[in-house]
């Protein structure tokens, strides 16, 4: 089926690529795709295109990669050129998903039918950069996708529609991300079909109550603080898969990445951070409340391994201790 509604798309990572693929696959014309500039990545730090750029190029879609869209920012000439390109590209609406650049009011005013954002949380909870990570870390029972009409605030626009999904006890950011990416792709296509049919989308202002912010995940957060409850640390490990991973550092300075862990059903004596049990089923570490069973680990320079395989080449032993990070 083909459509007449012309969609400029702005996005960068895999989450956004899923939405672009759905929009393009549904038959909506996409006259221009905006994505962030190529970035160095991998061991060789070679420039790599974003997932959105790769999809666009594979399907013959025009791509622009301005470093900024703010005339008053660091790249005024490139921003002015990109804004000029937007104005010169006939279109009806812009869809934005995890683009990573600020859209000033001047840009928001260009699309005749406005800018729709695909956000991976149930707004107004978890506005900001890392809503999937923070929902798992906080122990939320559910999350979802919200479509909103963009304004200049940080995820403050009026809500068009939402879809909800339960967060299971074994969900990681990776698994939840993939599920939400597909939910967002489906929801935006439904909204665009409605917009084409009626010429408008009803939107409801966000409530003032329940606002929380999902700050960007920093590498410094990876260190597990064994003084915290085991249940909290288990959520942290799930939230930080695939980035940055949980980290435990032994007293001899050996750093171990912790990719999977569950609260242990056995009591562990000893101070927080002390290894209380080492078996093929897991390494049990005492916590401030309860104990944590580590089930998937990684040595520096090694691969993620189930604990049974990890222990075949490791000397972890009962009584060893993980360092406690400096209290914040």
Curated annotation (Swiss-Prot):
InterPro entries linked: Fmt, Formyl_trans_C, Formyl_trans_C_sf, Formyl_transf_N, Formyl_transf_N_sf, Formyl_transferase-like_C_sf, GART_AS, Met-tRNA-FMT_C
Protein name: Methionyl-tRNA formyltransferase
Binding site for (6S)-5,6,7,8-tetrahydrofolate: 121-124
NCBIfam families in UniProt: fmt (TIGR00460)
Role according to the record: Attaches a formyl group to the free amino group of methionyl-tRNA(fMet). The formyl group appears to play a dual role in the initiator identity of N-formylmethionyl-tRNA by promoting its recognition by IF2 and preventing the misappropriation of this tRNA by the elongation apparatus.
Keywords: Protein biosynthesis, Transferase
Any one GO MF annotation of this record: methionyl-tRNA formyltransferase activity
EC number, as in UniProt: 2.1.2.9
Natural source organism: Paraburkholderia xenovorans (strain LB400)
One GO location term (cellular component): cytosol
Reaction catalyzed: L-methionyl-tRNA(fMet) + (6R)-10-formyltetrahydrofolate = N-formyl-L-methionyl-tRNA(fMet) + (6S)-5,6,7,8-tetrahydrofolate + H(+)
Family to which the UniProt record says this protein belongs: Belongs to the Fmt family.
């Amino acid at each position: 089926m083909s459509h007449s509604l012309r969609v400029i798309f702005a996005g960068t990572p895999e989450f956004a690529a899923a939405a672009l693929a759905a929009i393009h696959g549904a038959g909506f014309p996409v006259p221009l795709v905006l994505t962030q500039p190529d970035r160095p990545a991998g061991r060789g730090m070679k420039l790599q295109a974003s997932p959105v750029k790769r999809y666009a190029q594979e399907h013959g879609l025009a791509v622009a990669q301005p470093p900024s869209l703010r005339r008053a920012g660091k790249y005024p000439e490139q921003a002015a050129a990109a804004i000029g390109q937007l104005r010169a590209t006939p279109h009806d609406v812009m869809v934005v998903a995890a683009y990573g650049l600020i859209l000033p009011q001047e840009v928001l005013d260009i699309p005749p039918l406005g800018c729709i954002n695909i956000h991976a949380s149930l707004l107004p909870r978890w506005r900001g950069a890392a809503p999937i990570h923070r929902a798992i870390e906080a122990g939320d029972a559910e999350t979802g996708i919200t479509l909103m009409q963009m304004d200049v605030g940080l995820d403050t626009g009026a809500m068009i529609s939402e879809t909800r999904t339960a967060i299971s006890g074994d969900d990681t950011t990776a698994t939840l991300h993939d599920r939400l990416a597909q939910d967002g792709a489906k929801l935006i296509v439904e909204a665009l079909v409605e917009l084409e049919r009626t010429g408008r989308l009803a939107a409801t202002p966000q409530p003032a109550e329940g606002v929380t912010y999902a700050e960007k995940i920093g590498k410094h957060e990876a260190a597990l603080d064994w003084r915290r409850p085991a249940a909290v640390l288990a959520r942290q490990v799930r939230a930080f898969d695939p980035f940055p991973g949980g980290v435990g550092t032994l007293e001899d300075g050996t750093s171990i990445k912790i990719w999977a862990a569950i609260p242990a059903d056995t009591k562990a004596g000893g101070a927080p951070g002390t290894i209380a049990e080492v078996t093929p089923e897991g390494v049990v570490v005492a916590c401030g409340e309860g104990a944590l069973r580590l089930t998937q680990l990684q040595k520096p320079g090694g691969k993620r391994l189930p604990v049974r395989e990890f222990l075949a080449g490791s000397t972890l032993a009962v009584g060893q201790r993980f360092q406690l990070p400096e209290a914040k």
